[in-house]
Amino acid sequence: MHIKTGLIVGTLLLSNHAFSLSSQVVPEKCQSQCVKLQMLGTRGPELLDGQASTGYLIWLDDKARVIIDAGPGSLQRFKQSKANFEDVDMILFTHFHADHSADFPSYIKGAFFTDRKKDLSIMGPTGTKFTTSATEFAERAIGSEKGLYPYLGAFLDPKQHSAYKIKVKDIPWSFSDLTIKEVSNKDGIRVTTVSTHHGPFPSQGYRVELAGCSISFTGDMNGRLGEMPTLAKDSDILVAHNAVPEDATGVAANLHMKPSYIGKMAKQANVKKLLLTHLMERSLPEKRKQESLNLIRKNYKGDVSFPNDLDVIRP
C-alpha cells in the first residue's frame, strides 16, 4: 500500500512539474511586423524648430496601446498619427516636468468626444518637494476639488458617473532602491520600471514588452546610478535622451547624461537600435549631433538615429 501510494504521489508530482514547465511562457521572437514605435515629440522644453516636446506612442497590431510622456505639442502629433485614443491602455510618465506632461489634461478633454469605454491607466513616480506624485499630478490637473480643470474630475472620482475611469498608480522612487519593478502585465503588454537619477527630480525608466519585442525608455537622467543597462538589457529599441553635449557642466550635467555615457549604456545593454531624442539647443545643431554620434560610436556599434516627430520605427 505504501509503495502504491508513493508511486501515485510521485506520478502526480511529476505530472504537475511537467504541467508547470509546459505552462511557462517561452520568450518568443520579436514579431516586428506587429509592433511599431512612433515619435510624438522629439525635443525638450525649448521653443526651437517646430518639433513637439517629449512623447512616444507604441502600436500593436495597428492599434495605439501605450503612450509614454505627454509633453506640449505631443497631443497634436497623436492626432496626426491617426491613432484612436479609445485603444490606448496606459500613459506612462517618466517624470512630471512640464515638457513631459503638459498635454495630459488635453488628452482627457479630447477623449470626452470619443467612444472610449475602458479604463485608462496612468503611472509615474512618487513625489518630493520638487515635483508631484502621479496621484497628486492627476488630482491637480483634473481633480474635482483642487484640479485646474475640475469639470473633468468625474474621470478620476469613482463616485461620479463617467464613461471610463482613470486609474492612477504611484511608482515608489528612490536613489537607494534600484529594483526593477513590474507595474503592469495584461492584455499582451508587460511594463517594468526602475528609478533613475534626474538630479533631485523623481524619474523613471521604462521597458515595454509586447509580441516578443522590447522597447526601453531612459527618460531624463544622468546615468549616475547605472540603472538603465539592466532594465534595457537586449532591448530591440532603446530611446535615450540626448539633451546635453559632452562638455556640459553644472546643473545640465546633473540632470542629463552625456553622449559618451549613452554609448556605454547602449553597449552594456546590448540593444539593437538606439534612438536619440529630447534634443535641445545645446545638442540639436548638426555639429553637436555629429559630435554626440562620434562619442557614442566609440562604444556602441549598433544602429543609431535621430528621429523627428511622427517618424515610425519598427523593432
Identify what each model region corresponds to:
Residues 5, 42, 94, 218, ...:
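Ser/Thr-centric signal marking residues that sit
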Residues 205, 212-214, 221-311:
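Cap/insert and terminal regions of metallo-dependent hydrolase folds
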